Amino acid sequence: MDTFPSLFPPGGDSRLNPEPEFQNMLIDERVRCEHHKHNYQALKIEHKRLQEEYVKSQNELKRVLIEKQASQEKFQLLLEDLRGELVEKARDIEKMKLQVLTPQKLELVKAQLQQELEAPMRERFRTLDEEVERYRAEYNKLRYEYTFLKSEFEHQKEEFTRVSEEEKMKYKSEVARLEKDKEELHNQLLSVDPTRDSKRMEQLVREKTHLLQKLKSLEAEVAELRAEKENSGAQVENVQRIQVRQLAEMQATLRSLEAEKQSAKLQAERLEKELQSSNEQNTCLISKLHRADREISTLASEVKELKHANKLEITDIKLEAARAKSELERERNKIQSELDGLQSDNEILKSTVEHHKALLVEKDRELIRKVQAAKEEGYQKLMVLQDEKLELENRLSDLEKMKVERDVWRQSEKEQCEEKLRASQMAEEAARRELQSTRLKLQQQIVNTEKAEKEKLENSELKQQISHLQIQVTSLTQSENDLLNSNHMLKDMVERLKQECRNLRSQAEKAQLDVEKTLEEKQIQWLEEKHKLHERITDREEKYNQAKEKLQRAATAQKKRKSLHENKLKRLQEKVEVLEAKKEELETENQVLNRQNVPFEEYTRLQKRLKDIQRRHNEFRSLILVPNMPPTASISPANFQSAVTVPGAELSFPPHLQEEQHQRELSLLRKRLEELETTQRKQLEELGSPGE
């Protein structure tokens, strides 16, 4: 509004100004407006270009941040790999330390070797002692059984002799008594009435039936005796089997003892091999110790080289950091001087520059404080830049509004607007240049700050690595000293172990010699015992063979006797049958004679026949009663002739004499049966004693 008086003359009369001048002024004003429009369009295009450049710069910032993150991740991976390698090396060192033999481990190895060497030998000696005690117990048991059986045999022998003598005395007394009875019977028969012969015949028939029953009972007893004989043979076979089994067991024990001797020899050889293997293991451990010493020396040289390289890298990094700091300070001073020299009209650009400075200061502080919060700050910067972009767009819209208002005002203030527009154009061009320069400087500052941050991080990481390496170097030096000390100790222990191994070898050789001596002594004892056992076995076999021969002889004799007895029994049965038939004929003849008168010739013939029958009957009785004695006729033909007075009269004995004779015969048969039983028992006892 203040510029209007300068446009019009002071007189104030519009009539004085002609119309063509006014039209010219309007034309000029229109030209200026068009020129302003063209400028506005150019500014708009420039604004779009600046926005695109801003977007590009943001994209570049993102890319740079991504590259920074990738580089950080790579460095972290490298650090982790290096740490893993250090951990593995530390583990290897610990393993080597564990593999190194300490005096305690050597003592444990010694104890284990002693246990492994002594335990099987102790067990072997213990088993041998147990077997020796077991064999002694068995030998004592067999000796006790032998003495017991011997005493029983002697006792049975004495009893047998006593019983045999008693039975001999009995038999002698009975024979004497029987002879007396025989004489008495002979006298009685001479004094007996011949009329009682018929009763005597009946009594003889009864006796015959009784004798047949006795024969049957005797046959049953003979069958029982056969069964007993078979049982005795089975017992003898069982005894023989038991002896064979005992022989096999003794042979098996001898074989087992020989096998144990061989196993003891093999065990001694195995112990020698184990000693050789232990010596080889000691040599291997010594070689491993030398290798460990070499590796430790190589590791120490590598550690020294790493120390030197780290020192050089640290010095290089320090120099580069000092150069970067000086360059950054110079650039900051330049930027501050350039920012101070900017015009006061462009307040928007100043506010953005101040805001960027504040952001840079905050970014520097936050990077110094927190290295790990770089990502968050980058995102915050992006948000701040987006906010700034919005603010710039709002300000540009405000500027456009102001331009519209100014266009309205410029219609009245043409000259002032032209001057201001020119000044603003110049200022805008200068501002654009300054903005471009500031943007380039900001980008350089951002890159420099990122480089500085990277360098700081690398410096911190390198410092940490250096500290870790120093710790490792100290630990390695300590481990080297420990290993050297342990090597000296190990050498001493190896020498001691060698001496102990020599002592152990000498002790083992002595023990082996002692064991061999004991084994030889035991072998000699076992051979003596074996020889004794063989002698005992041969004696037993001889006794057994003798007993077997005796049994066979007795069996053959028994068979012969049995066959003889059977033949005699058959003959006697035939004779008895013949006598029965003759007796029946005589009875019929007697009946006929009793019914009719018999002539003298027939009577004499019948009398002779009766005498013959009586003689045969007496022979049969004598054979039954005393089979070994020759048959004797107790009644002579003269006695019979004198005894016979009446023809047709029956021959008979008194009843009390018949009963006594029958009882005597029964007693004789019982005695004979008892004698057979005693003889068979004696034979069985004789067979049983050598079998046992």
Curated annotation (Swiss-Prot):
Residues 32-625, 656-689 form a coiled coil. Component of the distal appendage region of the centriole involved in the initiation of primary cilium assembly. May collaborate with IFT20 in the trafficking of ciliary membrane proteins from the Golgi complex to the cilium during the initiation of primary cilium assembly. Interacts with CEP164 and IFT20. This is Centrosomal protein of 83 kDa. It comes from Mus musculus. The gene is Cep83. Belongs to the CEP83 family. InterPro entries: Centro_Cilium_Assembly. GO terms for cellular component: centriole; ciliary transition fiber; Golgi apparatus. Its main location: cytoplasm. It is found in: Cytoplasm, Cytoskeleton, Microtubule organizing center, Centrosome, Centriole. The modification Phosphoserine is found at residue 689. It comes from the Eukaryota. One of its GO terms (biological process) is establishment of centrosome localization. Keywords: Cilium biogenesis/degradation, Coiled coil, Cytoplasm, Cytoskeleton, Phosphoprotein.
